[in-house]
Design a protein with these regions (language model features):
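Short, flexible, basic/aromatic active-site loop/helix in glycosyltransferases
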Residues: 135-160
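Glycine-rich, basic loop-to-helix element that forms the pyrophosphate-binding segment
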Residues: 63-80
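Short aromatic/hydrophobic "clamp" motif used to bind/position activated sugar donors
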Residues: 85
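Conserved donor NDP-sugar-binding/catalytic core segment of glycosyltransferases
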Residues: 97-135
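A conserved acidic beta->alpha catalytic loop
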Residues: 23, 37-47, 65, 92
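Short, well-formed alpha-helical segments that are part of the catalytic scaffolds
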Residues: 12-26
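A short, conserved alpha-helix in the catalytic core of glycosyltransferases
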Residues: 162-170, 174-178, 185-212
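Non-catalytic, C-terminal membrane-associated alpha-helical segments of glycosyltransferases
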Residues: 231-241, 247, 251-299
């Protein structure tokens, strides 16, 4: 079937899913939504059942238990009936004419897999303010030494690169051939990077298109989806999955990137994550408490 199947895994994020579903359906190129209910404990399943009964373009499957993002994406892709799949998210917002723009630029660039600019927008910002802020970003889109990239950078023109923002558009058969690796557990860190790098290594052309924009709202105290675990456990999964990713793809990384010794890279990555996401925030809280105690005793 011509058109686009949008695959959306979701877990306990019903307020955001309610906004996302009609937004995707408003895009002319979208023929169906495939929602994968991944062990939700809220009223997501009931909402999706009712929405599907009202609109035949909405299809769903219930994992019953939480199987994780990669497994859920693969399951949704297998159920997709359109020629193209877009890997959606339950809190994603897309710009006007998003899919028309991506399809047009996919044709002109010869891209096999294409992603738009993905901006992480603060809750207090408007879309325009978030775009203006990220327009100031400089430097390369992909940093081959740190194995990272800026998903919201304004590159001005389309460009081929080995890493892309997570929301991707490609032919359904490509997603089914490459597949997400569902051995990435926990918060599934690196699942998209792993998929993209393997696709790149297989000869597929990956293109970043700044002319189509998606927005992820940075939600304070988000406890749904991959954010449902505690901070220490979340960082632990990031480190484990990064180790798995680097070890698994070490030959391709050595050929296409500049990370140096994989063991040293993995160690540096782990130290930086633990310090910036666990130790430093704890120090800030500790410092504030000391100042508060000092002010209280001085009053």
């Amino acid at each position: 079937m011509m058109g686009i199947s949008v695959v959306i895994p979701t877990k306990d994020r019903l307020p955001y899913l309610r906004k996302t579903v009609p937004m995707f359906l408003a895009q002319e190129e979208v023929e169906e939504l495939v929602i994968v209910v991944d062990g939700c404990r809220d009223a997501t399943l009931e909402y999706v059942e009712a929405a599907s009964a009202r609109d035949g373009r909405i299809r769903y499957v219930d994992n019953v238990t939480n199987r994780g993002l990669p497994w859920s994406r693969n399951r949704g892709i297998e159920l997709a009936e359109c020629d193209y799949v877009f890997t959606g998210e339950d809190d994603l917002e897309v710009s006007e004419n998003f899919f028309a723009t991506l399809l047009a630029h996919m044709e002109t660039t010869g891209a096999d897999i294409i992603s738009g600019r993905n901006i992480f927008q603060h809750e207090s910002e408007s879309h325009a303010e978030a775009i203006a802020r990220t327009n100031k970003a400089t430097g390369p889109s992909v940093n081959r030494r740190t194995l990272s990239f800026d998903p919201g950078i304004n590159t001005k023109t389309d460009q081929e690169q080995p890493l892309l923002p997570a929301p991707m558009l490609a032919r359904t058969d490509i997603f089914r051939k490459v597949k997400y690796d569902d051995s990435f557990r926990g918060n599934a860190w690196r699942e998209e990077t792993d998929f993209q790098l393997r696709a790149y290594g297989a000869g597929y052309k990956l293109v970043y298109c700044p002319h189509a924009i998606t927005f992820n709202i940075v939600i304070v105290n988000d406890r749904g989806g991959v954010h449902s675990t505690g901070q220490v456990k979340r960082v632990s999964w990031i480190i484990k999955n990064n180790w798995q990713f680097v070890t698994k793809n070490r030959e391709l990384l050595a050929r296409e990137f500049e990370i140096g010794s994989p063991r040293i890279y993995i160690a540096k990555f782990a130290v930086k994550r633990v310090f910036t996401e666990i130790i430093l925030p704890a120090m800030v809280i500790w410092k504030r408490r000391i100042f508060a105690t000092f002010r209280g005793s001085s009053a």
